[in-house]
Protein backbone atom coordinates (compact mmCIF):
# COMPACT_ATOMS: atom_id res chain seq x y z
CA UNK A 1 0.00 0.00 0.00
CA UNK A 2 1.51 3.37 -0.99
CA UNK A 3 2.26 5.87 1.75
CA UNK A 4 0.41 9.16 1.88
CA UNK A 5 2.52 12.24 1.21
CA UNK A 6 3.66 13.98 4.36
CA UNK A 7 1.67 17.08 5.16
CA UNK A 8 3.56 20.26 5.61
CA UNK A 9 2.84 22.37 8.64
CA UNK A 10 1.11 25.66 8.15
CA UNK A 11 3.27 28.70 8.88
CA UNK A 12 2.76 30.57 12.11
CA UNK A 13 -0.01 33.19 11.80
CA UNK A 14 2.28 36.20 12.20
CA UNK A 15 5.46 34.65 10.80
CA UNK A 16 6.17 37.11 7.99
CA UNK A 17 3.83 39.94 8.91
CA UNK A 18 4.18 42.76 11.36
CA UNK A 19 1.54 42.93 14.06
CA UNK A 20 -1.31 45.38 13.42
CA UNK A 21 -1.09 48.59 15.43
CA UNK A 22 -3.70 48.89 18.18
CA UNK A 23 -5.82 51.95 17.35
CA UNK A 24 -7.01 52.58 20.92
CA UNK A 25 -3.46 52.59 22.26
CA UNK A 26 -2.30 54.88 19.46
CA UNK A 27 -5.15 57.29 20.30
CA UNK A 28 -4.14 57.14 23.97
CA UNK A 29 -7.49 55.78 25.21
CA UNK A 30 -8.09 53.21 27.94
CA UNK A 31 -11.90 53.13 27.77
CA UNK A 32 -14.39 53.92 25.03
CA UNK A 33 -17.37 56.20 25.58
CA UNK A 34 -20.46 55.96 23.38
CA UNK A 35 -20.75 59.77 23.35
CA UNK A 36 -17.31 60.15 21.73
CA UNK A 37 -18.52 59.77 18.15
CA UNK A 38 -15.31 61.09 16.59
CA UNK A 39 -13.36 58.19 18.07
CA UNK A 40 -16.06 55.64 17.27
CA UNK A 41 -16.14 56.67 13.60
CA UNK A 42 -12.58 55.35 13.28
CA UNK A 43 -13.97 51.86 13.98
CA UNK A 44 -16.85 52.11 11.47
CA UNK A 45 -16.60 51.60 7.70
CA UNK A 46 -18.06 54.01 5.15
CA UNK A 47 -21.15 51.81 4.98
CA UNK A 48 -21.63 52.02 8.75
CA UNK A 49 -20.42 48.52 9.63
CA UNK A 50 -18.19 47.80 12.62
CA UNK A 51 -14.64 47.03 11.49
CA UNK A 52 -13.19 43.64 12.47
CA UNK A 53 -10.35 42.98 14.90
CA UNK A 54 -8.08 42.04 12.02
CA UNK A 55 -8.52 45.54 10.57
CA UNK A 56 -8.39 47.57 13.79
CA UNK A 57 -5.80 45.52 15.68
CA UNK A 58 -7.80 45.60 18.92
CA UNK A 59 -7.73 42.93 21.61
CA UNK A 60 -10.82 40.80 22.23
CA UNK A 61 -11.88 42.85 25.24
CA UNK A 62 -11.32 46.15 23.46
CA UNK A 63 -13.27 44.98 20.39
CA UNK A 64 -16.21 44.03 22.63
CA UNK A 65 -16.04 47.41 24.35
CA UNK A 66 -15.96 49.28 21.03
CA UNK A 67 -18.83 47.21 19.59
CA UNK A 68 -20.99 47.86 22.66
CA UNK A 69 -20.22 51.59 22.54
CA UNK A 70 -21.10 51.75 18.82
CA UNK A 71 -24.38 49.91 19.42
CA UNK A 72 -25.25 52.28 22.27
CA UNK A 73 -24.42 55.30 20.09
CA UNK A 74 -26.66 53.92 17.34
CA UNK A 75 -29.52 53.52 19.82
CA UNK A 76 -29.05 57.14 20.90
CA UNK A 77 -29.02 58.21 17.19
CA UNK A 78 -25.44 59.48 17.40
CA UNK A 79 -24.20 57.05 14.72
CA UNK A 80 -25.99 55.59 11.69
CA UNK A 81 -27.08 51.99 11.33
CA UNK A 82 -25.60 50.06 8.39
CA UNK A 83 -27.49 50.48 5.14
CA UNK A 84 -28.96 53.89 5.95
CA UNK A 85 -26.76 55.77 3.52
CA UNK A 86 -27.69 57.61 0.34
CA UNK A 87 -29.76 55.43 -1.96
CA UNK A 88 -29.57 55.84 -5.75
From Swiss-Prot:
Task: Name the Gene3D superfamilies on file.
Answer: Ribosomal protein S18
Any one Gene Ontology MF annotation carried by this entry is: small ribosomal subunit rRNA binding
Entry keywords, A to Z: Ribonucleoprotein, Ribosomal protein, RNA-binding, rRNA-binding
Keyword rRNA-binding on entry: yes
Q: Which InterPro entries match?
A: Ribosomal_bS18, Ribosomal_bS18_sf
Record-linked Pfam families: Ribosomal_S18
Does Aminoacyl-tRNA synthetase appear among the keywords?
no
Quote the subunit structure annotation: Part of the 30S ribosomal subunit. Forms a tight heterodimer with protein bS6.
Q: What NCBIfam families does its record include?
A: S18
> What is this protein's record name?
Small ribosomal subunit protein bS18B
The species this protein belongs to is: Mycolicibacterium paratuberculosis (strain ATCC BAA-968 / K-10)
